[in-house]
Amino acid sequence: MSNVVVMGAQWGDEGKGKIVDLLTRESDVIVRFQGGNNAGHTVLVGEKQYILHLIPSGILHEGKKCLIGNGVVLDPEVFCREIDSLRAQGVDMSPARLMISRKTHLIMPYHKVLDQAREAHKCKDAKIGTTGRGIGPCYEDKSARIGVRAADLAMPELLRSKIEAALVEKNALFTGLYGQQPLDADAVFEEVMAHGAKLVPYLADVSSEIHDAWAEGRSVLFEGAQGTHLDIDHGTYPFVTSSNTVSGNAAAGSGVPPTKLDRIIAIVKAYTTRVGAGPFPTELDDATGEYLQQKGHEFGATTGRKRRCGWLDAVVLRESVRLNGPTDIALTKLDVLSGLKEISICTAYTYRGEQVAYPPQEQNGMAHVTPVYETMPGWDDDITGCTTWESLPAPVKAYVLRIEEITGVRISLVSVGPERDQTIRR
């Protein structure tokens, strides 16, 4: 039995979907422990591409149980739409293999309206690039202890009272500050209950389900969303998400003790990308950046937005290692670098006249660093057909080993293409 946490080591979009899908074969239960539908996993199975926003990608494997933990914020409308889409493609979506924690907080219609109104109201320089899906406002209500939880769907009177109480404040903001029309409590209640009727059969005690699985000797895979440097506490604040994305939250967001987590795999893309606003020291606003974007198909699975691209930032990776304590690294999209004559790695920053090995902690400090690069030979070889470590060209192996040396963490998986079988185990 092995319990594995998979988390992103950069700004999200590291290729977690493929690695989770690969590791699912070796797991019995897959748990999503934070975030909402602001993140998307793209999984390629044969000729079929699946994009999952809420439901763990383990659902694509027969016989696997998928759980959505208390650390997630769930949009009932999106959840129901995702269920219908997967079911139409022949995937078993029965409550016996997909469960939602009763403690999971729900994204309400007014959360989405507030998220979009607030971002539109900000001046250009203050925008943080939110997806506008209500994630932040939902986490706000959770922290303020006025949120709606999944279990409330089975208690209509409690749900209605929570909606009415929330709209007293939300409507004051809509009409008084943002110039929006007020929302009607009855309309919101009816909309939520319409989706809630489909959602209630999936409610369960997720913590208990995980502990029962362990008692039976089964393995659990904890699937993180987004990336370390979008973490609400440890990311490039304020250009971050609203939840903790680091590995430690796998326990809190699922209802299990951290001592049960055996292995932590950090997913690292072979170059760096970022969606939306925020500092990005190694960003390439040139032909090389365009090359990476086009060859790597760097467009958001959730928003379709172009991802900003740049060289691998080892300063960011060192911080990720310090925060997450990974046992090993899965290196993804190495094949995208094929065709580049030279490849650079940022090994340090210059900040306030000094060379530093870790990101500055002041707000927007990373917007004022200068990357220090080392350059390595590139390669022209197409490596997508390589199936063993020995078959990789020498410059490719040198690049992988250099990343391993800088981070101090073994790279156990090397992805050389989007398919499941285009992965080399070391």
Curated annotation (Swiss-Prot):
GO biological process terms, semicolon-separated: 'de novo' AMP biosynthetic process; IMP metabolic process
Keyword Metal-binding: yes
Quaternary structure and interacting proteins, as annotated: Homodimer.
Name assigned to this protein: Adenylosuccinate synthetase
Entry keyword Nucleotide-binding: yes
EC top class named in words: ligase
Positions contributing to GTP binding: 12-18, 40-42, 307, 333-335, 415-417
Protein family (similarity comment): Belongs to the adenylosuccinate synthetase family.
Cofactor: Mg(2+)
List of residues binding Mg(2+): D13, G40
Species assigned in the record: Nitratidesulfovibrio vulgaris (strain DP4)
Lineage, broadest ranks: Bacteria, Pseudomonadati, Thermodesulfobacteriota, Desulfovibrionia, Desulfovibrionales
